Protein backbone atom coordinates (compact mmCIF):
# COMPACT_ATOMS: atom_id res chain seq x y z
CA UNK A 1 0.00 0.00 0.00
CA UNK A 2 1.37 3.35 -1.07
CA UNK A 3 2.00 6.05 1.46
CA UNK A 4 -0.04 9.18 0.84
CA UNK A 5 1.74 12.38 -0.12
CA UNK A 6 1.29 14.91 2.71
CA UNK A 7 1.62 17.74 0.18
CA UNK A 8 -1.03 16.34 -2.15
CA UNK A 9 -3.54 19.07 -1.33
CA UNK A 10 -1.06 21.88 -0.88
CA UNK A 11 -1.56 25.11 -2.75
CA UNK A 12 1.19 27.13 -4.40
CA UNK A 13 1.06 29.38 -1.36
CA UNK A 14 1.67 26.42 0.95
CA UNK A 15 4.73 25.32 -0.99
CA UNK A 16 6.11 28.83 -1.06
CA UNK A 17 5.61 29.30 2.65
CA UNK A 18 7.36 26.00 3.38
CA UNK A 19 10.23 26.90 1.04
CA UNK A 20 10.63 30.33 2.61
CA UNK A 21 10.76 28.83 6.09
CA UNK A 22 13.44 26.42 4.88
CA UNK A 23 15.43 29.27 3.34
CA UNK A 24 15.40 31.29 6.53
CA UNK A 25 16.46 28.18 8.47
CA UNK A 26 19.37 27.50 6.12
CA UNK A 27 17.79 24.28 4.83
CA UNK A 28 18.53 25.07 1.21
CA UNK A 29 18.07 21.59 -0.21
CA UNK A 30 14.56 21.46 1.26
CA UNK A 31 13.84 24.95 -0.08
CA UNK A 32 14.93 23.92 -3.58
CA UNK A 33 12.75 20.81 -3.47
CA UNK A 34 9.65 22.76 -2.45
CA UNK A 35 10.26 25.58 -4.91
CA UNK A 36 10.79 23.19 -7.82
CA UNK A 37 7.69 21.22 -6.85
CA UNK A 38 5.71 24.45 -6.66
CA UNK A 39 6.75 25.45 -10.16
CA UNK A 40 6.09 21.97 -11.56
CA UNK A 41 2.59 21.71 -10.06
CA UNK A 42 1.51 25.32 -10.50
CA UNK A 43 3.42 26.66 -13.53
CA UNK A 44 0.95 29.49 -14.15
CA UNK A 45 0.47 30.58 -10.56
CA UNK A 46 1.97 33.97 -9.63
CA UNK A 47 4.05 32.21 -6.99
CA UNK A 48 5.78 30.21 -9.73
CA UNK A 49 7.66 33.24 -11.01
CA UNK A 50 8.86 34.11 -7.52
CA UNK A 51 9.87 30.47 -7.09
CA UNK A 52 12.05 30.69 -10.21
CA UNK A 53 13.94 33.59 -8.68
CA UNK A 54 14.25 31.92 -5.29
CA UNK A 55 15.53 28.70 -6.89
CA UNK A 56 18.51 30.58 -8.32
CA UNK A 57 19.24 32.12 -4.93
CA UNK A 58 18.81 28.79 -3.13
CA UNK A 59 21.29 27.04 -5.41
CA UNK A 60 23.75 29.88 -4.77
CA UNK A 61 23.37 29.41 -1.01
CA UNK A 62 23.64 25.63 -1.44
CA UNK A 63 27.03 26.09 -3.15
CA UNK A 64 25.83 24.81 -6.51
CA UNK A 65 27.14 27.59 -8.79
CA UNK A 66 26.37 25.93 -12.13
CA UNK A 67 22.78 25.26 -11.10
CA UNK A 68 22.48 28.82 -9.76
CA UNK A 69 23.68 30.32 -13.05
CA UNK A 70 21.39 28.03 -15.03
CA UNK A 71 18.38 29.00 -12.90
CA UNK A 72 19.24 32.70 -13.17
CA UNK A 73 19.56 32.48 -16.96
CA UNK A 74 16.25 30.66 -17.14
CA UNK A 75 14.54 33.35 -15.06
CA UNK A 76 15.83 36.08 -17.37
CA UNK A 77 14.79 34.13 -20.44
CA UNK A 78 11.25 33.61 -19.12
CA UNK A 79 10.87 37.05 -17.54
CA UNK A 80 12.94 39.52 -19.60
CA UNK A 81 11.03 42.57 -18.33
CA UNK A 82 10.79 41.61 -14.69
CA UNK A 83 11.64 44.50 -12.33
CA UNK A 84 14.09 42.25 -10.48
CA UNK A 85 16.38 41.59 -13.45
CA UNK A 86 19.01 43.84 -11.86
CA UNK A 87 19.07 41.46 -8.89
CA UNK A 88 19.54 38.49 -11.23
CA UNK A 89 22.55 40.09 -12.92
CA UNK A 90 23.97 40.82 -9.49
CA UNK A 91 23.37 37.24 -8.39
CA UNK A 92 25.10 35.85 -11.48
CA UNK A 93 28.04 38.17 -10.97
CA UNK A 94 28.29 37.17 -7.34
CA UNK A 95 28.16 33.44 -8.08
CA UNK A 96 31.16 33.68 -10.40
CA UNK A 97 32.87 36.20 -8.12
CA UNK A 98 32.67 33.73 -5.25
CA UNK A 99 34.03 30.77 -7.19
CA UNK A 100 36.53 32.68 -9.32
CA UNK A 101 38.40 34.83 -6.81
CA UNK A 102 41.32 33.29 -4.99
CA UNK A 103 42.80 31.72 -8.11
CA UNK A 104 45.83 33.95 -7.70
CA UNK A 105 46.59 32.77 -4.19
CA UNK A 106 48.73 30.02 -5.69
CA UNK A 107 49.82 28.35 -8.87
CA UNK A 108 47.43 26.18 -10.82
CA UNK A 109 47.77 24.15 -14.01
CA UNK A 110 47.42 26.35 -17.07
CA UNK A 111 44.04 25.01 -18.17
CA UNK A 112 42.55 25.42 -14.70
CA UNK A 113 43.97 28.93 -14.33
CA UNK A 114 42.55 30.01 -17.69
CA UNK A 115 39.18 28.51 -16.76
CA UNK A 116 39.15 30.45 -13.51
CA UNK A 117 40.03 33.73 -15.22
CA UNK A 118 37.14 33.07 -17.62
CA UNK A 119 34.92 32.79 -14.56
CA UNK A 120 36.21 36.15 -13.33
CA UNK A 121 35.56 37.69 -16.75
CA UNK A 122 31.99 36.38 -16.63
CA UNK A 123 31.54 37.93 -13.20
CA UNK A 124 32.94 41.25 -14.41
CA UNK A 125 30.66 41.25 -17.45
CA UNK A 126 27.52 40.57 -15.40
CA UNK A 127 28.39 43.36 -12.97
CA UNK A 128 29.17 45.66 -15.91
CA UNK A 129 25.80 44.90 -17.51
CA UNK A 130 24.06 45.67 -14.23
CA UNK A 131 25.87 48.99 -13.81
CA UNK A 132 25.28 50.00 -17.43
CA UNK A 133 21.61 49.03 -17.71
CA UNK A 134 20.50 49.76 -14.17
CA UNK A 135 22.69 52.60 -12.85
CA UNK A 136 20.12 53.45 -10.17
CA UNK A 137 19.85 49.89 -8.88
CA UNK A 138 20.52 49.31 -5.19
CA UNK A 139 23.12 46.75 -6.30
CA UNK A 140 24.97 49.01 -8.76
CA UNK A 141 27.35 50.58 -6.25
CA UNK A 142 28.59 47.29 -4.88
CA UNK A 143 28.78 45.82 -8.39
CA UNK A 144 31.01 48.70 -9.50
CA UNK A 145 33.39 48.17 -6.56
CA UNK A 146 33.60 44.49 -7.41
CA UNK A 147 34.45 45.39 -11.00
CA UNK A 148 37.43 47.40 -9.73
CA UNK A 149 38.53 44.45 -7.63
CA UNK A 150 38.12 42.01 -10.51
CA UNK A 151 40.09 44.23 -12.86
CA UNK A 152 43.01 44.11 -10.44
CA UNK A 153 42.67 40.35 -9.95
CA UNK A 154 42.72 39.73 -13.70
CA UNK A 155 45.68 42.05 -14.16
CA UNK A 156 47.55 40.30 -11.36
CA UNK A 157 47.01 36.96 -13.07
CA UNK A 158 48.66 38.29 -16.23
CA UNK A 159 51.56 39.69 -14.20
CA UNK A 160 52.12 36.34 -12.51
CA UNK A 161 52.28 34.61 -15.87
CA UNK A 162 54.58 37.32 -17.24
CA UNK A 163 56.89 36.91 -14.23
CA UNK A 164 56.99 33.18 -14.86
CA UNK A 165 58.00 33.79 -18.48
CA UNK A 166 60.71 36.18 -17.30
CA UNK A 167 62.11 33.50 -15.01
CA UNK A 168 62.27 31.15 -18.01
CA UNK A 169 63.82 33.83 -20.25
CA UNK A 170 60.77 33.57 -22.51
CA UNK A 171 60.91 37.26 -23.36
CA UNK A 172 58.16 37.35 -25.97
CA UNK A 173 55.74 35.51 -23.71
CA UNK A 174 56.50 37.94 -20.88
CA UNK A 175 56.08 40.91 -23.21
CA UNK A 176 52.72 39.74 -24.52
CA UNK A 177 51.30 39.14 -21.05
CA UNK A 178 52.51 42.52 -19.81
CA UNK A 179 50.93 44.19 -22.84
CA UNK A 180 47.58 42.69 -21.89
CA UNK A 181 47.75 44.51 -18.55
CA UNK A 182 48.67 47.83 -20.16
CA UNK A 183 46.04 47.58 -22.89
CA UNK A 184 43.11 45.91 -21.10
CA UNK A 185 43.64 46.89 -17.49
CA UNK A 186 45.11 50.36 -17.89
CA UNK A 187 43.80 51.61 -14.56
CA UNK A 188 44.77 48.58 -12.51
CA UNK A 189 47.35 48.73 -9.73
CA UNK A 190 49.56 46.39 -11.80
CA UNK A 191 50.14 48.72 -14.74
CA UNK A 192 53.50 49.97 -13.46
CA UNK A 193 54.89 46.46 -13.04
CA UNK A 194 53.63 45.58 -16.50
CA UNK A 195 55.58 48.49 -17.98
CA UNK A 196 58.69 47.39 -16.09
CA UNK A 197 58.39 43.90 -17.54
CA UNK A 198 57.95 45.35 -21.03
CA UNK A 199 61.18 47.36 -20.66
CA UNK A 200 63.07 44.24 -19.58
CA UNK A 201 61.63 42.17 -22.42
CA UNK A 202 62.33 44.79 -25.10
CA UNK A 203 65.94 45.09 -23.94
CA UNK A 204 66.41 41.32 -23.98
CA UNK A 205 64.86 41.16 -27.45
CA UNK A 206 67.35 43.80 -28.66
CA UNK A 207 64.66 46.40 -29.29
CA UNK A 208 66.23 49.44 -27.59
CA UNK A 209 63.96 52.04 -29.18
CA UNK A 210 60.82 50.32 -27.91
CA UNK A 211 62.47 49.83 -24.53
CA UNK A 212 63.27 53.55 -24.35
CA UNK A 213 59.75 54.53 -25.38
CA UNK A 214 58.26 52.27 -22.73
CA UNK A 215 60.68 53.59 -20.13
CA UNK A 216 59.51 57.13 -20.84
CA UNK A 217 55.92 56.04 -20.28
CA UNK A 218 57.00 54.29 -17.10
CA UNK A 219 58.76 57.41 -15.83
CA UNK A 220 55.56 59.37 -16.30
CA UNK A 221 53.37 56.68 -14.82
CA UNK A 222 51.65 57.59 -11.59
CA UNK A 223 51.15 54.84 -9.08
CA UNK A 224 47.54 53.75 -9.04
CA UNK A 225 46.23 53.72 -5.50
CA UNK A 226 45.08 50.36 -4.31
CA UNK A 227 41.31 50.24 -4.03
CA UNK A 228 40.99 46.64 -2.96
CA UNK A 229 38.11 45.88 -0.67
CA UNK A 230 37.38 42.78 1.35
CA UNK A 231 34.00 41.72 0.05
CA UNK A 232 31.42 39.68 1.83
CA UNK A 233 29.91 37.26 -0.68
CA UNK A 234 26.65 37.03 1.19
CA UNK A 235 23.52 38.00 -0.68
CA UNK A 236 20.10 38.79 0.65
CA UNK A 237 17.07 36.73 -0.26
CA UNK A 238 15.46 37.75 -3.57
CA UNK A 239 13.02 40.65 -3.32
CA UNK A 240 9.43 39.51 -3.17
CA UNK A 241 6.89 40.80 -5.61
CA UNK A 242 4.69 43.47 -4.09
CA UNK A 243 1.49 42.02 -5.44
CA UNK A 244 1.14 39.35 -2.81
CA UNK A 245 1.98 38.51 0.76
CA UNK A 246 1.67 35.04 2.14
CA UNK A 247 1.66 35.83 5.86
Task: Tell what function each PLM region has.
Residues 1-247:
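Acidic, polar-rich low-complexity tracts and alpha-helical solenoid repeat scaffolds
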Amino acid sequence: MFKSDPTENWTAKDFYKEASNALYSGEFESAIKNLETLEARFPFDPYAKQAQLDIAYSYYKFDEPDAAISAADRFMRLNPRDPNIDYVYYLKGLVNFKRGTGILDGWFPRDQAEHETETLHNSFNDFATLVRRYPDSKYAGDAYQRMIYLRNELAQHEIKVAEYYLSRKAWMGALNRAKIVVERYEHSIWRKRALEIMVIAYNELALPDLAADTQRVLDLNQDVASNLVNFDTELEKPPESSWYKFW
